[in-house]
Amino acid sequence: MISVTLSQLTDILNGELQGADITLDAVTTDTRKLTPGCLFVALKGERFDAHDFADQAKAGGAGALLVSRPLDIDLPQLIVKDTRLAFGELAAWVRQQVPARVVALTGSSGKTSVKEMTAAILSQCGNTLYTAGNLNNDIGVPMTLLRLTPEYDYAVIELGANHQGEIAWTVSLTRPEAALVNNLAAAHLEGFGSLAGVAKAKGEIFSGLPENGIAIMNADNNDWLNWQSVIGSRKVWRFSPNAANSDFTATNIHVTSHGTEFTLQTPTGSVDVLLPLPGRHNIANALAAAALSMSVGATLDAIKAGLANLKAVPGRLFPIQLAENQLLLDDSYNANVGSMTAAVQVLAEMPGYRVLVVGDMAELGAESEACHVQVGEAAKAAGIDRVLSVGKQSHAISTASGVGEHFADKTALITRLKLLIAEQQVITILVKGSRSAAMEEVVRALQENGTC
């Protein structure tokens, strides 16, 4: 973080300073990540109140506290009405001090892939900061912005949400030059209520654009009519591997089990791209990243080089060669209807006997059964050879697939999966489920067993 004094923060955050005025160059909300002299922000959540950990923060080396009430502790304290809001305001101030060119993105699925692709491209152009992991909520976005320093030329900020208004808040802190909605699908329906609710929440990202900013959206499933009032007269770019009239599209597509080759078509010209990631949906992700990067000046050569240097991310269609002719695709990090059906299409293009291993999709509310059935029907239409499921909801996937088996626990599923592997000369297995399903346990079991 750039250096700032407590007296400066008092003005920035409209707070009250008690104690000495010191200079700060680091901030944390986690007592496990304290650095000497840092500012400890005492956030209050539904299940915790970090004010209770102030003594621990002092013992760990914190130099000052950001609190919502005075504490009986010998440390300088900046007292504000709401530490969560103040944390965001501090991040917004840091963002305003740094001249880096900033882009932001959201979507129902593929956010992390697009973020990684965009960061890889912009890293060809200059020093690039990007969201670590999935720190994309109303706490994670400020954490990322606070890492900005004058050394950065670019920043790629991922915005997520599970309720209305969250992205409107985080994009107001981020102030991007360009903003992208990667796609829309049934995700977090418990918080949004419907796909229309998802669209409204994702469209909030465009409210943070300046008048000369660029709104970027997927031409295949955008919600343009509802977003038009938010976008106003700002420039709009559309991307799609399917729509030839899009601003960013792909031609000459050639898909293999290890990656994709295609010609990227853009408003400034075309370039041949080698994308070392499996799946047609990653072509759309690459188009999104190309558009987002080009909005802040990336060249075609930078786009080509950045995409070519990509590495697969564990848990996100990460290829694991169990043995010769035995390929495991670890897509266990998370799941919703959109990413599940995309994974089905990836598996459909893989060699040998194709097995889809699924856990539950979470946070779908009243639409849960219908969404799980939709994935099963997609597997059936794609010709997947076998579907194995585990969990409370995923039986709907295996049943709808017509080639499914459901298991009471992962141990039974893994036993069956090992038998299938032993029976097949060539096999590809794709493992996927929501974070709460912990399907990485299946992946680990197969890896530990080697050739099974």
Curated annotation (Swiss-Prot):
Q: Name one GO cellular component term.
A: cytosol
Q: Where in the cell is it found?
A: Cytoplasm
Alphabetical UniProt keywords: ATP-binding, Cell cycle, Cell division, Cell shape, Cell wall biogenesis/degradation, Cytoplasm, Ligase, Nucleotide-binding, Peptidoglycan synthesis
Say if the entry is tagged with keyword Cell cycle: yes
- State what protein this is by name: UDP-N-acetylmuramoyl-tripeptide--D-alanyl-D-alanine ligase
The species this protein was found in: Escherichia coli (strain K12)
Biological or metabolic pathway of the protein: Cell wall biogenesis; peptidoglycan biosynthesis
Task: Family membership, please give it.
Answer: Belongs to the MurCDEF family. MurF subfamily.
Name a single GO biological process. peptidoglycan biosynthetic process
Report the catalytic activity: D-alanyl-D-alanine + UDP-N-acetyl-alpha-D-muramoyl-L-alanyl-gamma-D-glutamyl-meso-2,6-diaminopimelate + ATP = UDP-N-acetyl-alpha-D-muramoyl-L-alanyl-gamma-D-glutamyl-meso-2,6-diaminopimeloyl-D-alanyl-D-alanine + ADP + phosphate + H(+)
Entry-linked Pfam families: Mur_ligase, Mur_ligase_C, Mur_ligase_M
**Which EC number applies?**
6.3.2.10
Describe the subunit structure. Monomer.
InterPro entries the UniProt entry points to: Mur-like_cat_sf, Mur_ligase_C, Mur_ligase_C_dom_sf, Mur_ligase_cen, Mur_ligase_N, MurCDEF_CellWall_CoF430Synth, MurE/MurF_N, UDP-N-AcMur_synth
Q: Does the keyword Metal-binding apply?
A: no
* Function, as annotated: Involved in cell wall formation. Catalyzes the final step in the synthesis of UDP-N-acetylmuramoyl-pentapeptide, the precursor of murein.
Give any GO molecular function from the UniProt entry. ATP binding
Q: Where does ATP bind?
A: G107, S108, S109, G110, K111, T112, S113
